Swiss-Prot record:
GO molecular function: aminoacyl-tRNA deacylase activity; ATP binding; leucine-tRNA ligase activity
Keyword Transcription regulation: no
Subcellular location: Cytoplasm
Organism classification: Bacteria, Pseudomonadati, Thermodesulfobacteriota, Desulfuromonadia, Desulfuromonadales
The protein's enzyme class: ligase
Residues binding ATP, per UniProt: K584
Alphabetized UniProt keyword annotations: Aminoacyl-tRNA synthetase, ATP-binding, Cytoplasm, Ligase, Nucleotide-binding, Protein biosynthesis
Organism: Pelobacter propionicus (strain DSM 2379 / NBRC 103807 / OttBd1)
Acetylation among keywords: no
Superkingdom of origin organism: Bacteria
GO cellular component: cytosol
Entry EC no(s): 6.1.1.4
Protein name in the entry: Leucine--tRNA ligase
Family indicated by similarity: Belongs to the class-I aminoacyl-tRNA synthetase family.
Encoding gene (name): leuS
Motif ('HIGH' region): 42-52
Length: 823
């Protein structure tokens, strides 16, 4: 029998056994409670990185632990396989995206299997599989029928490098989230999902997710951005219509002196007088190519242009010039802002720059503001002035009063708006899910009939690197008869945003072999919601919000019962090295393959779990990896060295244990308690592993000559191996087998700690006099209060502080301290 730890041999052996025996396959016919565990599935980029190793190791510990705790654990894996990198690789390498993607999947699957992850590989899916995206097309058609999918012309975020549209959430600091190119504004016909219809439910249900990090919930609430206010109509001079604004500050309406429109506002050009047209067009073009995030930044220079038109303040009847302003966006409110320069800093800076009127309508109590001497806008609450019948009223009270007045006079309506905008899903790329729509000159927009699904992504596509989608140049794909009238028609050539696929994959895992509909309601309702979801904080708004939206839509379409997809969410930290996130450009990447080849998967897993709590960044260091490997070698040697001792051990006689044996057993059961609590309640894997390391030290120095040394050591080593099983499953399985234990560890129950054994015989207690530490005493565990008081009062170190004073009170906190109050 191999005595030296050989991770390669051990890991290969057990990976083969797990695969052959389908050890982690599950179904719904179980009397165990279900537990659905999921890590965010990866994009098949070619190979896994250390972030994957950490993420999937975290999930695997939870899955193996829950399995040993008696749960029916669903732990699937798949591939978020559509997307631009495959298409770009096709252009660069002259390889079809499908070939590139599936080769990467095969390679990465092998890498994940080498990590010993407990996935039910029978449920594996790839979003580029026809059997997956066909059902997504059906869901699209059902959303279209319900008015949840629609097409409109709008300004969109355009990445000139990727040559495709980006959702607002995919623009980071004015750049494309994938390639970092500056994003431009472009007007296109686009397909949208009506996520705004679910804005209030998405917001209110954040209160029903106590298992989510507060940071993520705050980010989602802010992105949804609910605001209470008024929509107010400002009539155009000359009686030719009006400009509608949304404001959360109706109390400032008497101070509105000009109007600011977003350059993209639909009325911008029609309000421009002929003499202003050239200047306005130049301004619109300039702003269109400006980073949107810069436009709203506090330190960005406020610029604008006068349109030549005026509107009328409905309360003051003052004539207000209408400007286009670079800091106003169309995707908040109505895209028009009533400018109140004395009470809004951006308006103040703009008015000062262009010489526009300032009028104070809110004063701080006891102070008079003079517009001529103001150096900044006054934005705090105060007392109303220059506001007609509302003068003297508090500004907070005036918000409601003026809103009511506007509504009564027909000049405005109290309303609620959201920052959230509908989700633009059109992408001008090939490697994605075709949008199942046909355009007919006679019939208009015609959904592809369900009997004609799926719309297959054609394989005979040429990748030239030219702009736009290759599908738009493929006549055999484009030209089709209209399903309604039979006349020549054209297919939609846009594909869906890849975030659509990741918005429901967790549901399809529940029934990947179901061929009659997108989802099998019975099986989905058994498994959903996901009990524990694991992924990066960078998905807080994008993927997680879309997944919540899709779950609610599918609930309303009758496919699922649940309203929220993920009960608990863990956002793990990054893996960093030399103070920076690992990346090829920084030259600080650690190759998991090389790591596993040298040390084994168990060592890689152990270090990634031990070096930091899951939610914190992990700072990579080679010494830590060496330390983890040495620890596993010590475990291996200890168990193998003690096999003979424990093999012939008599059953454990607890009442007959010696004091030394009892101490050793106490260490074992305290460790079981500690590791159980750390994994189950807090996912503090680092402190759980540290506790096992401490136990190993105790076991290595244990006296083997005591009467029941073999029996105590047998229980201790069995517990040690079981506690390590979720972290280092290959070694644990091998040692378990060598110890002569029947069955696999995956079906072996987690050890239960003996409450009596885990309690210390003696405890160290602090003794204070008037709150100051004066001594420490060792007492028998479970001593009653009177005994503790007597021991404290009699202690030699305490006695000098009791001379010549009266003991007024003795406060006892069992197991911790005794405080003697004197005076």
């Amino acid at each position: 029998m191999e005595q030296k730890y050989n991770p390669a041999a051990v890991e290969q052996k057990w990976q083969q056994q797990w695969e052959t025996g389908a050890s982690f396959a599950v179904n719904e016919q179980s009397d165990r409670p279900k537990y659905y565990l999921l890590e965010m599935f990866p994009y098949p980029s070619g190979r896994i990185h250390m972030g994957h190793v950490r993420n999937y190791s975290i999930g695997d510990v939870i899955g193996r632990f829950k399995r040993m705790r008696g749960f029916n654990v669903l732990h699937p894996m798949g591939w978020d396989a559509f997307g631009m990198p495959a298409e770009n690789a096709a252009i660069q390498n002259k390889s079809h995206p499908a070939k590139w993607t599936y080769e990467n999947i095969d390679y990465m699957r092998g890498q994940l299997k080498k990590m010993g992850l407990s996935y039910d590989w029978g449920r594996e899916l790839a979003t580029c599989d026809l059997e997956y995206y066909r059902w997504e097309q059906k869901i699209f058609l059902e959303m279209f029928a319900k008015g949840l999918a629609y097409k409109k012309t709008s300004y969109v975020n355009w990445c000139p490098t990727c040559e495709t549209v980006l959702a607002n959430e995919q623009v980071e600091d004015g750049a494309c989230w994938r390639c970092d190119s500056p994003v431009q504004q472009k007007e296109l016909d686009q397909w949208f999902f009506r996520i705004t219809q679910y804005a209030e439910e998405l917001l209110s249900y954040t209160e029903k997710l106590p298992g989510w990090p507060e940071r993520v919930l705050v980010m989602q609430k802010n992105w949804i951005g609910k605001s209470h206010g008024c929509e107010v109509d400002f009539p155009l001079e000359g009686g030719t219509g009006s400009v509608r604004v949304f404001t959360t500050r109706p109390d400032t309406l008497f101070g509105a002196t000009f109007m600011s429109l977003a350059p993209e506002h639909p009325q911008a050009r029609e309000l421009t007088t002929p003499d202003r047209r050239d200047e306005v067009e130049r301004f619109i073009e300039k702003v269109r190519n400006t980073d949107r995030s810069k436009r709203t930044a506090d330190d960005y220079e406020k610029e604008g242009v006068f349109t030549g038109s005026y509107c009328i303040n409905p309360l003051t009847q003052v004539r207000m010039p209408i400007y286009l302003a670079n800091f106003v966006l169309t995707d908040y409110g109505t895209g028009a802002v009533m400018a109140v320069p004395t009470h809004d800093q951006r308006d103040f800076e703009f008015a000062k720059k262009y010489g526009l009127d300032l009028k104070v309508v809110i004063q701080p109590e006891g102070t008079t503001l003079d517009p001529a001497t103001m150096e900044a806008a006054y934005t705090e609450p105060g007392i109303m002035v220059n506001s007609g019948t509302f003068d003297g009223m508090g500004s907070e009270e005036a918000k409601q009063a003026i809103a009511d007045h506007l509504q009564e006079m027909g000049g405005g309506t109290k309303t609620v708006t959201y920052r959230l905008r509908d989700w633009g899903i059109s992408r001008q790329r090939y490697w994605g899910n075709p949008i199942p729509v046909i355009y007919c000159d006679c019939c208009g927009v015609v959904p592809v009939p369900e009997k004609d699904l799926p719309v297959r992504l054609p394989m005979d596509v040429e990748f030239t690197g030219e702009g736009g989608s290759p599908l738009a140049r493929l006549e055999s794909f484009i030209n089709v008869p209209c399903p309604t009238c039979g006349k020549p028609a054209r297919r939609e050539t846009d594909t869906m945003d890849t975030f659509v696929q990741s918005s429901w994959y967790f549901l399809r895992y529940c029934c990947p072999d179901f061929h009659d509909a997108p989802l099998d309601r019975t099986r989905v309702d058994y498994w959903m919601s996901v009990d524990q979801y694991i992924g990066g904080i960078e998905h807080a708004v994008l993927h997680l919000l879309y997944a919540r939206f899709f779950t609610k839509v599918l609930r309303d379409l009758g496919y699922v019962e649940c309203s929220e997809p993920f009960t608990n969410l863990l956002t793990q930290g990054m893996v960093i090295k030399d103070g920076a996130k690992m990346s090829k450009s920084k030259g600080n990447v650690v190759d998991p393959n090389a790591l596993i080849e040298r040390y084994g998967a168990d060592t890689a897993r152990l270090f990634s779990l031990f070096a930091a709590p899951p939610e914190k960044d992990l700072d990579w260091n080679d010494q830590g990896v060496d330390g983890s490997f040495r620890f596993l070698n010590r475990v291996w040697k200890l168990v193998n060295d003690r096999l003979e001792l424990i093999s012939g051990a008599a059953p454990l006689d607890v009442p007959g244990l010696t004091g030394e044996e009892r101490t050793l057993r106490r260490a074992v059961h305290k460790t079981i308690r500690k590791v159980t609590e750390d994994i189950e309640g807090r996912f503090h894997f680092n402190t759980a592993i540290a506790a096992v390391m401490e136990l190993l030290n105790v076991l290595q120095s244990a006296d083997l000559s005591t009467p029941q040394a073999g029996a105590v050591m047998k229980e201790a080593l069995e517990s040690l191996v079981l506690l390590l099983a979720p972290f280092v499953p290959h070694m644990a399985e091998e040692l378990w087998q060598r110890m002569g234990q029947p069955g696999a560890l995956s079906t072996t129950p987690w050890p239960e700690y003996d409450r009596e054994a885990a309690v210390d015989d003696e405890v160290l207690m602090v003794v204070q006099v008037n709150g100051k530490l004066r001594s420490k005493i060792t007492v028998a565990a479970g001593s009653d209060e009177e005994s503790l008081k007597a021991l404290a009062l009699a202690d030699d170190k305490v006695q000098p502080f009791l001379q010549g004073v009266q003991v007024r009170k003795v406060i006892c906190v069992k197991g911790k301290l005794v405080n003697i109050v004197v005076g």
